[in-house]
Amino acid sequence: MASATDTVSAGSTPRDKVVTRFAPSPTGFLHIGGARTALFNWLYARHHGGTYLLRIEDTDRARSTDAAIDAIFDGLEWLGLGGDEPAVFQFARSDRHAEVAHKLLEAGHAYRCYLTQEELAARRELAQAERRPFRIDSEWRDATPDQWPADQSYVVRMKAPREGETTIVDKVQGSITVQNSELDDFIILRSDGTPTYMLAVVVDDHDMGVTHVIRGDDHINNAFRQLVIIRGMHAIEGGWPDPVYAHIPLIHGADGAKLSKRHGALGVDAYRDEMGLLPEAVFNYLLRLGWGHGDEEIISREQAVAWFDIGDVNKGASRFDLKKLLNLNGHYIREADDARLAALVAPRLATLAPGFAPDKGLDLLTRAMPVLKVRAADINELAAGSVFLFAQRPLAMAEKAASLLTDDARAILTKVAGVLEAENVWTTGVLEATVKQMAEELGIGLGKIAQPLRASLTGQTTSPGIFDVLALLGKDESLSRIRDQAA
């Protein structure tokens, strides 16, 4: 049991090696806040040459699903945040958790509590009526075995200290003090003998060798209760040092409200599959949510590992800004390898462009990337922008594009087809020079040719540079599309 006045200081317990952990509950997909927690744990371990572990807290059997577990692992791997060792599954360790509970019980740090649900409800109502906090004050706390009733179910509660105070010097939040009188005798074993979350977390962290507990600041209150267990076990057998705590602030929406889907907060899988974001962009954006290095906005993984320290994380809540994330993704799209982008775009073209065949179209898609990615903010935009390359003739015309194809414009296209037919060198530069010369000879502006030409080649009013489009489509396909729309 913890002593009356205790302080656990960040860094007060010497360890040979930093060990962090990310411990999600598989009751839903990996959300953006969880991904950032994983990132900070991964970075802190990497920065200190330590180990980063994963634990699946699947004790809520009714809500835990295999699909959620798979999505968590998939999302972490996509972000490059897979664990250094095989993941630990909490439910499988229930016997170990119960073993620790019985040690605490036998040593007098915990006790059997026979209070019924009706008794607890009555005491809770009385506390509400008297407008005071409800605290468990069980008459069973100091009962002896001969006083235990036969054939009556019980829970096992920790004996929380009642006098003095406990202070945690948190790596992020600083010094936090709680009066021990505010701690209640919380349950560690339910009446059916199953361990509670509060106990399981402590036992797993100890057995996994976790030295630094980095998690959301909604767990601050849990830390004081978990220390009661830790110090109880340390008093019994030693070797249960206090962890270093770092409670990071939650993420809010741009309006300061609790983060939700309306702010663009989705599961990590949705950022990849639905929004078409790159993992390096999400990694970089999450890194900058509550932490920074000067004015640096673009930070590589290597730089992040070198610069990151958990003590530099802001205390205040960060605000999620979807627009900034998309802008950052656009930067990484432009920096990305063309073949990689083409491979990411290809699956989306199965529905967008029926004429796309991966075995034949991937090379063209790769060659088109340098001009396509200049305008795109995500993989979806890249896919949409590349559809014209694989469109089937005759092209379906967007309404605005069709409006450009007047009789005069179609007559110009006929002349363009004739001039280009004679061109033997089919490159962007040569094609541009040829069309510009034609415009001069006709005494018209380049736009008078370029606009209907774009419509005939793409079916749209916007596209990459028109001469890039001609070069990518090739001579035969370009001339066929132009003649489809010519007078």
Curated annotation (Swiss-Prot):
Transmembrane segments: none annotated. A motif ('HIGH' region) lies at residues 24-34. It is found in: Cytoplasm. GO terms for molecular function: ATP binding; glutamate-tRNA ligase activity; tRNA binding; zinc ion binding. It holds the Pfam family tRNA-synt_1c. The keyword Kinase does not apply. It comes from the Bacteria. InterPro entries: aa-tRNA-synth_I_cd-bd (IPR045462), aa-tRNA-synth_I_codon-bd_sub2 (IPR020751), aa-tRNA-synth_I_CS (IPR001412), aa_tRNA-synth_I_cd-bd_sf (IPR008925), Glu-tRNA-ligase_bac/mito (IPR004527), Glu/Gln-tRNA-synth (IPR000924), Glu/Gln-tRNA-synth_Ib_cat-dom (IPR020058), GluQ/Sye (IPR049940). GO terms for biological process: glutamyl-tRNA aminoacylation. SUPFAM superfamilies: An anticodon-binding domain of class I aminoacyl-tRNA synthetases, Nucleotidylyl transferase. Keywords: Aminoacyl-tRNA synthetase, ATP-binding, Cytoplasm, Ligase, Nucleotide-binding, Protein biosynthesis. Belongs to the class-I aminoacyl-tRNA synthetase family. Glutamate--tRNA ligase type 1 subfamily. This is Glutamate--tRNA ligase 2.
